[in-house]
């Protein structure tokens, strides 16, 4: 059976996410390490961003990279382990743009990503999910080359126990990651490809123009992903329905089974034996309905689809 969970808030402290995951009987969960709309770029991460480390295996977590104390990180690790949960995954800040044509933003993004990787390692998280970014008015090819350079610099300066996970995107504007070919190129051209993986976001994939709404659609899209990138690179799912129609290039999430994708895609994914030991995290709207947490409602639906 896949590991079900959701993105959870760390407002009030890291432990709050673990407490919410336990309350909702999740197997796994995703968090931000700090506010996703604010930069966290420690000086030492900025210094590391400007050069490559010679031996990746020698890189260890350093407190100066972290947006929290080592004591809080240790308490967090102990809490999710004692709860019997799978290791969490971190989502990087929305401000990071590894494809940026602007040198200052690119360097700042690399430094911020290095800090995210150190933070994830301190928390016992196995990976950091990041959107590849946008070259804006520059060409796709140049944007991809910049992402490859950024990824290699980040991984050379990051603890080796954390993977960098490229997320599929909806294709809004000039953002990279909406085509499987783009992600494959980044992975193939990286000198650290063994530490790169992919997050398959259902809402993004659907909005980008990859069909998912029927079981046949789902299998066809997964087969194309396998031929282009390889299912061995697929490390985590974001299970989200889409408020926007197929091929819209718009990123707006909806509760599972209530959007344009529909329930069959999720039935297909949760019952595919190839994904029986993969994390599946929801990023659906938060809130309550009739006094019931919306994450609980969506989790109930997922569990009801299991055969």
Regions found by a protein language model. Name each.
Residues 7-11, 32-36, 93-95, 133-135, ...:
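Active-site beta-loop-alpha junctions enriched in small/polar residues
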Residues 148-256:
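Acidic/histidine-rich catalytic cores of soluble enzymes
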Residues 1-4, 25-27, 82-88, 122-126, ...:
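Short, well-ordered coil/turn segments that N-cap beta-strands
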Residues 1-92, 96, 100-118:
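N-terminal pre-domain/capping segments
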Residues 81-82, 97-197, 294:
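Active-site acidic/histidine proton-transfer and metal-coordination neighborhood
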Residues 219-230, 260-274:
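A short, acidic, amphipathic alpha-helical segment used as a generic capping/interface helix at domain edges
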Residues 21, 91, 109, 120, ...:
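Conserved, mostly hydrophobic/aromatic
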Residues 289-307:
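C-terminal helical cap(s) of enzyme catalytic domains, especially alpha/beta-barrels
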């Amino acid at each position: 059976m896949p590991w079900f969970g959701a993105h959870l808030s760390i407002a009030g402290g890291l432990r709050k996410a673990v407490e919410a995951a336990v309350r909702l009987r999740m197997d796994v969960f995703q968090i931000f390490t700090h506010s996703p709309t604010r930069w966290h770029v420690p000086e030492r991460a900025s210094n590391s961003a400007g050069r490559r480390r010679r031996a990746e295996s020698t890189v260890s977590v350093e407190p100066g990279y972290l947006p929290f104390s080592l004591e809080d990180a240790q308490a967090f690790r102990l809490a999710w382990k004692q709860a019997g949960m799978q290791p969490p995954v971190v989502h990087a800040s929305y401000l990071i743009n590894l494809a940026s044509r602007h040198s200052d933003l690119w360097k700042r993004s690399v430094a911020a990503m290095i800090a995210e990787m150190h933070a994830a390692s301190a928390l016992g998280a196995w990976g950091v999910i990041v959107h590849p970014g946008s070259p804006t008015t520059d060409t796709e090819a140049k944007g991809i080359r910049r992402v490859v350079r950024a990824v290699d610099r980040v991984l050379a300066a990051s603890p080796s126990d954390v993977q960098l996970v490229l997320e599929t995107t909806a294709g809004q504007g000039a953002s990279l990651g909406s085509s499987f070919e783009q992600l494959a190129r980044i992975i193939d051209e990286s000198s650290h490809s063994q530490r790169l993986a992919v997050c398959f976001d259902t809402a993004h994939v659907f909005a980008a123009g990859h069909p998912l709404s029927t079981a046949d659609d789902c299998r066809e899209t997964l087969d194309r992903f396998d031929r282009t990138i390889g299912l061995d690179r697929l490390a985590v799912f974001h299970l989200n329905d889409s408020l926007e129609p197929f091929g819209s290039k718009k990123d707006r999430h909806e509760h599972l089974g209530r959007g344009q994708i529909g329930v069959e895609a999720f039935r297909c994914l949760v019952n595919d034996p190839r994904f029986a030991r993969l994390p599946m995290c929801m990023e659906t709207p938060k809130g309550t309905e009739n006094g019931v947490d919306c994450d609980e409602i969506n989790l109930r639906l997922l569990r009801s689809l299991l055969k």
